[in-house]
């Protein structure tokens, strides 16, 4: 459960991301593909080279979903219900991959927002991404 301080930290950090959300989303995907090559198996039809239009496009989708989640911190299940259905029933993404993308996103944010990425903000973002991952995998059962 996110505390009021966590929610404030998440909103402030995501506010700093601003217009770079799609770019950071794509960078986090690229980082995940490089660091955890098995994640590429879910994207057999993508050009996974750095800077590819498909990775940028999916990065924008990831960023849009996270932006929606930030806007609905008090109702993540409602905000992410369709995305949860998609990943559980159609795409069948192994739940561990959400943790890998979350880690890659944290590294990406830390590299772009070093002065804002305090231990408290890191902890809040980590909790937020864990909550998003939990919601996205909730319909697997």
Curated annotation (Swiss-Prot):
Tissue spec: Red blood cells.
Could you list the residue ranges that cross the membrane? none
Listed Pfam families? Globin (PF00042)
CDD domains assigned to the protein according to its UniProt record, in alphabetical order = Hb-alpha-like
Binding residues annotated for O2, in chain numbering: 58
Amino acids binding heme b: 87
Q: Which UniProt keywords apply?
A: Heme, Iron, Metal-binding, Oxygen transport, Transport
Family (UniProt): Belongs to the globin family.
Q: What does it do? A: Involved in oxygen transport from the lung to the various peripheral tissues.
Subunit organization:
Heterotetramer of two alpha chains and two beta chains.
Its name, as the record gives it, is Hemoglobin subunit alpha-1
**Species, as recorded:** Bos mutus grunniens
């Amino acid at each position: 459960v996110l505390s009021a301080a966590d929610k404030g930290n998440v909103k402030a950090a995501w506010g700093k991301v601003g217009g770079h959300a799609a770019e950071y989303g794509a960078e986090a995907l690229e980082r995940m593909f490089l660091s955890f090559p098995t994640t590429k198996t879910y994207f057999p039809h993508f050009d996974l080279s750095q800077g590819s239009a498909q990775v940028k496009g999916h990065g924008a989708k990831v960023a849009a979903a996270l932006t929606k989640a930030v806007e609905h911190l008090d109702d993540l299940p409602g905000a992410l219900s369709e995305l949860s259905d998609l990943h559980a029933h159609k795409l069948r993404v192994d739940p561990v991959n959400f943790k890998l993308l979350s880690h890659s996103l944290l590294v990406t944010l830390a590299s772009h927002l070093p002065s804002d990425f305090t231990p408290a903000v890191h902890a809040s973002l980590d909790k937020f991404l864990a909550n998003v991952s939990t919601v996205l995998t909730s319909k697997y059962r």
